[in-house]
Design a protein with these regions (language model features):
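Catalytic core of tubulin tyrosine ligase-like
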Residues: 2-3, 7-12, 20-201
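Short acidic donor-binding/metal-coordinating loop in glycosyltransferase active sites
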Residues: 16
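C-terminal non-catalytic accessory extensions
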Residues: 211-245
């Protein structure tokens, strides 16, 4: 009600620790508006059948989501004749909703089903001792916003390049992807590409980071009056100055 009273027709929702999440991306909002969708979400191609991402699928003529914990392994590993994953579309938790659709969901307490999640929960036993179990010992009931797809009158899925929109931090440092290090590398690579597109000569083996107050996308980088011509050392471009590290 508050959003509708303020004249807000669309609501962006991004819910995971992904610094590359394209908040209120103009192109995504444009597709959402042009298609007159109740829900628009962004997808990327999965790196592996066992990626810990939701699977965007079509069931009974509707776009729906199957959480990776609920996806049978034999289905996740299905391959098409050309060798690609059959269920390739990964949800990265980037959504745009019509506020009128969200209002409908809020008015129906049964619109979103419950999911069970097995959790490892510390607790105090009958003797007052604090117990820290190593195996799941509790069941948590959860609701997920992506289940709204099953009742959405119209849903649009937009595929994006992983390198431009997704660098989540989900794994420990020893993992090969979705770590703090791979996230920092992805941010630097994206910002380097923005600078190169704007005509800046940037060494490929340095770290580059751009403060969002300095520029939020490649277009804004190209419009900066203080854009450097060359960058040869690690740099953090801020709203006030360019700081060499």
């Amino acid at each position: 009600d508050k959003y509708q009273q303020a004249g807000i027709e669309h609501f962006f929702f991004g819910q995971i620790d992904n610094p590359l999440s394209p908040t209120c991306c103009p192109e995504l909002i444009g597709f959402h508006s042009l298609t007159d969708s109740a829900v628009t979400l962004q997808a990327i191609a999965k790196q592996d059948a066992q990626d810990k991402t939701g699977n965007i699928v079509q069931m009974d003529g509707r776009i729906q989501m199957i959480e990776y914990t609920e996806m049978p392994p034999q289905l996740a590993k299905q391959i098409t004749p050309d060798g690609q994953l059959n269920f390739w579309a990964a949800n990265i938790a980037v959504h745009i909703f019509k506020t009128s659709f969200l209002k409908q969901l809020a008015q129906d307490p049964t619109a979103l089903p419950f999911h069970t999640a097995h959790k490892t929960v510390a607790h105090i036993d009958q003797l007052g001792n604090q117990i820290h179990p190593t195996e799941p010992n509790a069941i948590k009931f959860e609701r997920f916003i992506f289940d709204s797809l099953s009742v959405s009158p119209k849903t649009t899925v937009i595929e994006a390049d992983r390198n431009f929109v997704f660098a989540a931090v989900k794994n420990h440092a020893a993992a090969s992807f979705n770590t703090v290090d791979t996230c920092q590398q992805a941010i630097s690579a994206l910002h380097r590409n923005w600078l190169i597109a704007a005509g800046v000569q940037v060494d490929m083996d340095i770290t580059v980071e751009i403060d969002p107050y300095w520029a939020r996308n490649a277009q804004q980088v190209g419009e900066r009056p203080d854009l450097p011509q060359t960058i040869k050392t690690d740099i953090f471009l801020t709203s006030s100055r360019s700081t060499a590290r």
